[in-house]
């Protein structure tokens, strides 16, 4: 299906942006759960908290484990805000392998932190220049071409439905294929 010229010329590009804590990662994780019928590759980030305070982030490969991404403790040379960013990600080979057979790529987040990790940034750029359909959360500062959704506490449910409908249209599936 994705070898047709239409898919190559019109790759799906849906991007979610919004303030920190508004629910971007929750939405991304929900999409992964709801779209089980598709082969999904990619990653999302999860907060690491100690005594109620955010102290870092984990890099979670969809369906294949997690590893540190950033920490308030020195785990790499580069910094973004108060976080030290790892120099490389141990699970990047798993992401690359899964991308080859994926129907849909989901990434959370594309932002300054991810840009500091050379191999990860190359992978993100490669995905964005490919014909693979992509749904990703992006930092407000990133200028990436595609349809952008500004997530707020008020519009979370509508944005979720809109994104699911866009994916349905793209893959030509029936309305009831994916649960709402």
UniProtKB/Swiss-Prot annotation:
SMART domains: AAA
Summary of the function given for this chain in its UniProt record: Has nucleotide phosphatase activity towards ATP, GTP, CTP, TTP and UTP. May hydrolyze nucleoside diphosphates with lower efficiency.
Record-given protein name: Nucleoside-triphosphatase THEP1
Catalytic activity reported: a ribonucleoside 5'-triphosphate + H2O = a ribonucleoside 5'-diphosphate + phosphate + H(+)
Species: Metallosphaera sedula (strain ATCC 51363 / DSM 5348 / JCM 9185 / NBRC 15509 / TH2)
Record-stated family: Belongs to the THEP1 NTPase family.
InterPro entries: AAA+_ATPase, Nuc-triphosphatase_THEP1, P-loop_NTPase
Residues where ATP binds: 18-25, 104-111
UniProt EC number: 3.6.1.15
Keyword ATP-binding: yes
Residues in the signal sequence: none
Keyword ATP-binding: yes
